[in-house]
Amino acid sequence: MIFLSNSETIKIRYIDSPALEQKDGSDWIDTYIAEDVSMQPGEFKLISLGFACQLPDGYEAILAPRSSTFKRYGILQTNSIGVIDNSFASDSDLWMFPAYATRPVVIAKGTRICQFRIQKKQPTIDFIPVEHLTASKRGSFCSTGI
């Protein structure tokens, strides 16, 4: 079980994964792949992480590659980041890493390739249409620092 605070915990069912733990000083929790993986360039594979979780109401998880994953293994997470909400919570809802290989690769079971964090869900947002926004112009995409 992972503790969120004094009163909140996460139920976790390990199918084929070492116990997860949050390292001191880190906001993210590393995960381990639950199978040996062999991929060729251009191949897609859902890689099992070997566990399922039941997140508390009002929380979601964000799954992302570790910073070294592409450099070491040449794989990309195809959905950029994964958002796992608390409705994905049954025994059969195994967490997966959707990988795309850019080069031939073999990755051993138990290797850390991704990480996740748990956060509160975004509150309901009411959008208010206006004719003009009051902030000053900052430039276009990728130009605010120029």
Functional labels for PLM-detected ranges:
Residues 1-146:
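DUTPase catalytic domain/fold
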